[in-house]
């Protein structure tokens, strides 16, 4: 009985970097609501959760009224605003997840999409060129960097990613420098996607876990360039 209305039936989703407004039909009644999350997959996840809560006896309107209190989990399309730019930190570290978040960004972009991506060491090597290909296909510029290389040679990991890349990209092994470069490239209305670590606050190099946070790196850059 639940239908997410198509664009022909109604403007289904109005998206910007701050959230998604959408219309759905349930038991012959139409509802419009807003969630502070972006991405079509988050709309579907929300509707699934809403129906489960409704089955427990809660009215749809009562559930929708709580939407202002909903926030995406830390590191899941987590937004940091920088002037007209949206910087998203996301845990995407598989081909499917990378495709989902970049397709979501395409839906509301007004400028370019710049993507920072890497792959973990001592993990599935077959996904590396695939993720490189996806990042390049759905971004205007890609920065390939380290992401928990562990005991593998970081350059070997990057070389594996490079097998799938094309177009406008560059390699900056040091993730701190990669994020700073991505931030420096931003022009009006551009989006920066920083993928792979999400909620993690560490970088694993060799067998050592070193403190590192994508969010902190972005916030530090903003503080240092606030008067630029």
Go through each PLM region and give its residues:
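A structural connector/turn signal
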Residues: 1-2, 36-38, 181
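ATP-dependent carboxylate-amine ligase
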Residues: 27-28, 48-228
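Hydrophobic residues in beta-strands and at strand termini
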Residues: 24, 35-37, 165
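Acidic-glycine-rich active-site phosphate/pyrophosphate-binding loop
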Residues: 15-31
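Short pre-catalytic strand/loop immediately N-terminal to key active-site residues, enriched for Gly-Thr
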Residues: 33-38, 85-89
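Short glycine/threonine-rich catalytic loop with a Thr-x-Gly-x-Asp
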Residues: 20, 37-48, 71-76
